[in-house]
């Protein structure tokens, strides 16, 4: 009988950690070799920023030197928010005995940000610091060691926040902790004072209030208990609630004088604006003695104006008048004339709607020229010429914030009176319009920036108000959003659990020790592993995404996410299905949260026809269905339903989704494979933000996998699946016989003989053909943005998806392995010195190695292949690496992992922030699949079976299920499960054997 050892989290136990530091590899010429999952020192500290906070609750980062950065606690990213705050230690009787508890400031911080020529007077960079620092992470804990020849103390800083797989609520708390541990390294008794000092970085015009052991930073004009609390648990703490009030640098100068002279000040809170506050904790340290002071950070910001896709303010578009350009959370607006333009994004982004109608004017010139930008939704976001109550001309943007010139020929309307109506009737992405510089002229080539004397400027929007224009409100709300709880903007989950900031503090104080113990259980179990160090580093570093601003959790607990994070707003909204396909961490660590995504996709985002929006509204609500579905996202979602069902073991959950899953698959068949040949031939939108025309290996492999998943689910529920079995066979045949060239899978580009209209007529992101050269390219090569004969790194991703979801890969496995080896051979670069990239090169450039998205080893590269083809994406690197490992190519897979992690060495990129279209990009959580690839460990809760298919022989590794987590090991072909939290009910072990090791 197999022995199962279970440890409940409340039981005391000891782990023996076996953490490998692994091999070392050169990163860049002249740079020392990197050791994975190890300590960062020197220049490798430069860009480290380690997220601390709860899932969907906001975050701050602990930098490699010990400073705080990226303070983002008010429901949006604030990437460059480095608050004026610092911890310090003063040692009495020691020359130069006062130091900020940080290492030296990296020079990029001084000269890299904006206003770098102004001296950085709003930062703490000029204060004395420790000479030496080192950083090590064991997610979710980060540890910094500080040393200084002048300070007889060894200092250890530990930052963390709760992260407990299967306990999503306690992992979503708005708080974090930084612990400062001091050890007296001298032979003398040391009298010291620890201090924590901060301006009101929440609102410089706000108030500072008292809380036990510390202070609360409160926004102005807020009567409720909102804001951020900073406090210690030490009974000896004394607090100065109001720094010196003066001018210039008075406040911070006096504050430092008090810290460095050990002048403990205890000013009481005041009613007005307080510039800053300090906490002082005196300490006596005997020789060799160690003491720890913990700084607690708790916050409560229950409200936001964040919406995506929901019409929240009917008729409020345009009412704030002209705009001076780019509005908050808007991409850069360019190409307008003068100082102002009309921009319906003003006052609420895409959520506000309304119409604006001009006074009548007489048409007495041949042409009307103007500028337009914004969304490409002619029926909803448009400029219209109205004559006799009818719309005779219409123009819209092209899904761009760059204004472009338009011209209407008014020859047929001479002498008539007309009005201009500007409409914004969309609350969805690109649901805004921008216009400027309406000019009547007889000259078709009139220069809008300096109209001639014969031209008539109807409107240039340079006045402060919209004189001569009338606002019109729509007669009814634009969409039936399905919102029934009255919450029309993002409200974080924690605001439903806690009534105010004090309630957060109380809960944290009551549960802190238990939550630390449980979080340590996760850390210890994860790193108690014999897996390669580069793998542990890749997986654990990217778990930081779940603590970043990329992730939100709305008021009712449902999960919602961006693709990544821009500097001040999320990047690409709505739990995008074709990006989150790759992310394999959440479904194993927090399966209940992952299942809310399936429920949203199939029960909210999908209409009766089976069309599924690949982006989710915020708040979560019914969307419009006025753009393509995403083939890879929608088909991948079907496989994820299978995966999440097997992880949960919940048949009732599967039954509740099954009708929608069937409707979804039927839609995919009707829309992209209408003749049921087994491949996606009609144009299909995908993760590259374009449409592939004709059958391709990438999306058809998703189709094959989705059919496989649906057949398995149908048979389990005793549903008829004969049609889908036949189609599955045809799909397999198509992939292996028609889309495999003997070495790898490819695309058969097709744009004629389809049900779809011409590429010039269907909606698309940026694939317009309005210029002659684009039309000529269409005639000679076909649609832009295809990959054709290319060797696509994602070219067989549907089979990777099948494997990580627990499905068999139905394709010829020699073909699959051949494709993956071709990707390794052709697409992997040891450096980028001779690689050109006109797209987004910062992901990998110069001395960086990486895996290109696509190459054309057999020639016939399109003139304009898909738009990101020359880039390197970490999420795809990990996908390919794990799939190679599954096929026995362990060293090839690990080489890709190492090249990827070498780029994130701390010198030039943050090791805990892998970027793609934004920071903390979700696709990078494909790294979690490498754990499964190496070990073949998968727990099936439906059959209570633990599967093992090791590619590396004996091992010990982490495992997380729907009900608990621990470690699993294989030794001499015998499995042993150690459950350290919750429980894992195993009735059977199934160990597969292979010849790959």
For the regions a language model picked out, list residue spans one by one.
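Extracellular carbohydrate recognition and processing domains
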Residues: 385-433, 451
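Short Pro-Gly-centered flexible turn/kink motifs
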Residues: 59, 190-192, 284-299, 479, ...
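Short beta-strands within extracellular/lumenal beta-sheet-rich domains
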Residues: 279-281, 339-367, 378, 403-407
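Non-catalytic C-terminal accessory modules of carbohydrate-active enzymes
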Residues: 56, 67-69, 75-168, 844-847, ...
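Aromatic-rich carbohydrate-recognition surfaces in CAZymes
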Residues: 88-93, 97-101, 109-120, 184, ...
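Polysaccharide-binding surfaces and accessory modules of carbohydrate-active proteins
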Residues: 162-261, 279, 306, 452, ...
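Extended glycan-interaction surfaces of carbohydrate-active proteins
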Residues: 397, 532-567, 592-625, 671-695, ...
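Extracellular carbohydrate-recognition regions
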Residues: 306-324, 441-480
């Amino acid at each position: 009988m197999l022995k199962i050892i279970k440890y409940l989290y409340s039981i005391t136990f000891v782990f023996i950690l076996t953490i490998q530091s692994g091999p070392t590899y050169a990163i860049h010429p002249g740079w020392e070799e990197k050791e994975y999952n190890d300590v960062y020192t020197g220049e490798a500290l430069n860009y480290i920023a380690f997220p601390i906070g709860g899932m969907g609750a906001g975050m701050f980062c602990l930098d490699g030197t010990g400073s705080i950065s990226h303070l983002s606690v008010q429901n949006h990213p604030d990437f460059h928010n480095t608050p004026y705050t610092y911890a310090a230690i003063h040692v009495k009787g020691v020359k130069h005995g006062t130091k900020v508890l940080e290492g030296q400031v990296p020079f990029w911080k001084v000269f890299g940000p904006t206003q770098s020529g102004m001296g950085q007077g709003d930062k703490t960079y000029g204060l004395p610091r420790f000479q030496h620092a080192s950083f090590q992470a064991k997610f979710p804990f980060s540890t910094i060691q500080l040393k200084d020849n002048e300070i007889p103390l060894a200092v250890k800083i530990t930052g963390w926040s709760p992260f407990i797989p299967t306990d999503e609520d306690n992992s979503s708390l708005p708080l974090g902790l930084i612990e400062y541990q001091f050890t007296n390294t001298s032979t003398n008794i040391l009298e010291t004072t620890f201090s924590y000092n901060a301006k009101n970085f929440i609102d410089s015009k706000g108030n500072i209030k008292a809380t036990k052991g510390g202070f609360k930073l409160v926004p102005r004009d807020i009567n409720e208990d909102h804001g951020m609390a900073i406090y210690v648990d030490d009974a000896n703490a004394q607090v100065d609630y109001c720094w010196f009030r003066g001018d210039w640098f008075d406040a911070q100068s006096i504050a430092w004088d008090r810290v460095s002279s050990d002048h403990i000040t205890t000013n009481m809170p005041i009613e007005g604006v307080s510039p800053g506050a300090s906490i002082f904790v005196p300490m006596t340290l005997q020789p060799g003695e160690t003491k720890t002071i913990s700084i607690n950070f708790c916050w409560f910001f229950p409200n936001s104006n964040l919406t995506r896709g929901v019409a929240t303010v009917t008729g409020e578009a345009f009412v704030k008048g002209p705009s001076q350009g780019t509005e908050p959370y808007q991409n850069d607006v360019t190409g307008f004339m003068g100082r102002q333009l009309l921009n319906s994004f003003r006052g609420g982004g895409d959520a506000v709607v309304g119409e604006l109608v001009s006074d009548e004017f007489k048409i007495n010139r041949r042409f009307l020229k103007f500028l337009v930008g914004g969304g490409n939704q002619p029926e909803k976001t448009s400029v219209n010429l109205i004559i006799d109550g009818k719309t005779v001309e219409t123009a819209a943007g092209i899904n761009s914030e760059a204004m472009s010139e338009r011209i209407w020929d008014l020859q047929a309307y001479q002498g008539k009176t007309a009005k201009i109506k500007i409409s914004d009737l969309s609350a969805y992405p690109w649901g805004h319009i921008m216009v400027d510089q309406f000019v009547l002229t007889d000259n078709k080539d009139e220069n809008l920036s300096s109209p001639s004397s014969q031209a008539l400027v109807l409107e240039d929007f340079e006045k402060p108000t919209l004189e001569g224009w009338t606002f019109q409100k729509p007669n009814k709300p634009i969409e039936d959003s399905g919102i029934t709880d009255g919450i029309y903007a993002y409200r974080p989950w924690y605001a439903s659990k806690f009534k105010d900031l004090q309630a957060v503090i109380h809960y944290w104080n009551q549960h802190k020790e238990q939550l630390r113990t449980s979080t340590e259980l996760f850390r210890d179990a994860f790193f108690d592993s014999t897996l390669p160090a580069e793998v542990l580093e890749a997986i654990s570093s990217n778990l930081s995404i779940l603590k970043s601003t990329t992730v939100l959790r709305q008021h009712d607990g449902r999960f919602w996410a961006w693709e990544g994070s821009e500097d001040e707003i999320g990047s690409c909204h709505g739990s995008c299905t074709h990006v989150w396909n790759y992310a394999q961490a959440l479904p194993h660590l927090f399966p209940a949260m992952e299942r809310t995504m399936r429920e949203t996709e199939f029960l909210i985002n999908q209409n009766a026809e089976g069309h599924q929006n690949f982006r989710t509204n915020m708040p979560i609500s019914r969307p419009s269905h006025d753009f393509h579905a995403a083939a890879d996202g929608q088909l991948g979602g079907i496989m994820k339903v299978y995966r999440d069902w097997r992880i949960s073991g919940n048949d009732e959950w599967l039954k509740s989704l099954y009708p929608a899953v069937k409707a979804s698959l039927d839609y995919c068949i009707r829309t992209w494979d209408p003749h049921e040949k087994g491949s996606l031939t009609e144009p299909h939108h995908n993760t590259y933000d374009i449409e592939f025309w004709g059958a391709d290996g990438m999306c058809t492999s998703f189709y094959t996998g989705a059919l496989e998943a649906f057949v398995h689910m149908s048979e389990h529920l005793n549903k008829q699946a004969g049609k889908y079995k036949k189609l599955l066979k045809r799909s397999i045949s198509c992939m292996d016989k028609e889309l495999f060239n003997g070495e790898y899978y490819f695309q058969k580009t097709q744009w004629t003989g389809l049900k779809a209209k011409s590429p010039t007529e269907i909606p698309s992101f940026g694939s317009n053909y309005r210029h002659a050269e684009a039309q000529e390219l269409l005639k000679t090569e076909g649609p832009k943005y295809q990959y054709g004969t290319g060797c696509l790194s994602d070219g067989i991703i549907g089979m990777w998806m099948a494997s990580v979801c627990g499905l068999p890969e139905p394709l010829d496995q020699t073909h699959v392995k051949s494709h993956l080896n071709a990707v390794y051979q052709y697409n992997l670069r040891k450096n980028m010195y001779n690689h050109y990239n006109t797209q987004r090169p910062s992901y990998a450039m110069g001395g960086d190695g990486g895996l290109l998205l696509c190459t054309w080893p057999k020639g016939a590269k399109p003139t304009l292949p898909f738009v990101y083809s020359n880039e390197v994406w970490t999420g795809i690197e990990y996908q390919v690496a794990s799939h190679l490992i599954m096929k026995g190519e362990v060293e090839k897979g690990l080489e890709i992992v190492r090249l990827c992690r070498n780029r994130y060495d701390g010198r030039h990129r943050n090791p805990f922030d892998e970027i793609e279209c934004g920071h903390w990009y979700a696709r990078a959580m494909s790294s979690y699949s490498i754990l499964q690839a190496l070990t073949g460990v998968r727990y099936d809760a439906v059959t209570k079976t633990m599967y093992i298919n090791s590619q590396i022989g004996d091992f010990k590794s982490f495992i997380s299920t729907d009900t608990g987590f621990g470690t699993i090991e294989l030794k001499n072909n015998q499995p042993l499960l150690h459950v350290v939290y919750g429980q894992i009910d195993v009735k059977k072990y199934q160990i597969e054997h292979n010849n790959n090791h």
